[in-house]
């Protein structure tokens, strides 16, 4: 997502500009779990990754290859797991990655929104990113 754009693309750059080509083909949607549904998430927050024996590269390295391999391993071997709960490397906020098998447990009250400058500019401002 855009966290990766800010975190990895703008490192050490004085001018942090998000151009339309980076966001115009994308959309966003709000969703929640359906009534009576709950997600089973593998909690990678705090020291859990270390307790599970997961290498730190999986959750902290800017090259996402290790994390993608780990997620694929979880997806293929832990069929009861709907996704991953992890801390953002950028903001330290909690993030959830959900797998496609989770879609039947999710509902969305609205249609996807195409990302626009009007939507993104206030969201990106705290990180000194100008949205064109």
Region locations from a protein language model:
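Near-N-terminal "mature-domain entry" segment
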Residues: 1-4
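Active-site and NAD+-binding cores of ADP-ribose-processing enzymes
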Residues: 6-132
